[in-house]
Amino acid sequence: TAKWTISPMRLIIGRRKKMRTKFLDKPYLVWSVLFIVAPLIMVVYYAFTDKTGAFTISNMAQIPNYLSTILLSVLYGIAATAICLLLGYPFAYFLSKHTVRTQQTIVLLVMLPMWMNFLIRTYSLMTILGGSGVINTLLNKMHLGSLNLINNGGAVILGMVYNFLPYMILPIYSVLSKLDNSLVEAAQDLGSNRTTVFRRVIIPMSLPGILSGVTMVFVPCVSTFYITQKLGGGQIVLIGDVIESQFQSANNYNLGAALSFVLMILIFICLGVMNHFDSGTEDGGVII
């Protein structure tokens, strides 16, 4: 039998690569501990303690008083996510059919608003929808009368869609742009029409992008508070508004942390459900 030996030089190179990898991992681990793990621990700590630092469940006992607000937040998040999916998927699909240069240009335009400050984007929407905004100014000049486009639920959902739509488009586009066209051609050769190919080949294979987009849109929509304050006029109160008021106005960190803890658990459950649906997909999805 032949004996295989590894030269000392290869061992040294292999060890150096491992040491280099460990060294490069250190900053990420430090960053994760400082800005992810530590804040989560602080949230849990404040959620189960009172102002003196003693253990208590009184904060969690107040959660049922906010169940309707949590439910409303989930409903608004679902509505905004559904609209983003209905708008984002066709956009990403047709974008993936263009030339590479056109795709790069359009992707840049999609990402451009994301480089702007979130507050500026929301304020710009207020100037469009406000009573003296662009739309109502044009309507008044045409003697059609002004419309109440702000300080309502529709404006809040529109603000969510406007701010988070790129997070739906980009993951779906990323998957669709790498789609194996040979599978589509094979389905067409077997007699499938365009609708069947789209429903049973393209959509299943783009499922990872859909799930990523849904997650990236739903999570910030549920927890947002600035959009509701500016576009809802204080008439729409979501769980993010309650948490923000507990930390900023009421100075009740413990109740705010308890609500944040419940919201965090809700988000983890949603992510678990998404991962469950995504568990059967690999390399762009499966054909059903």
Language model segments and positions:
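Short membrane-interfacial helix/loop motifs at transmembrane-helix boundaries
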Residues: 30-67, 128-129, 229, 233, ...
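Transmembrane-helix boundary motif in ABC transporter permease subunits
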Residues: 22, 79-110, 126-127, 182-184, ...
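Non-cytoplasmic
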Residues: 39, 43, 168, 209-244
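C-terminal transmembrane helix and the adjacent membrane-cytosol boundary/short C-terminal tail
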Residues: 1-7, 11-14, 22-28, 35-38, ...
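Transmembrane alpha-helices
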Residues: 27-36, 82, 112, 162, ...
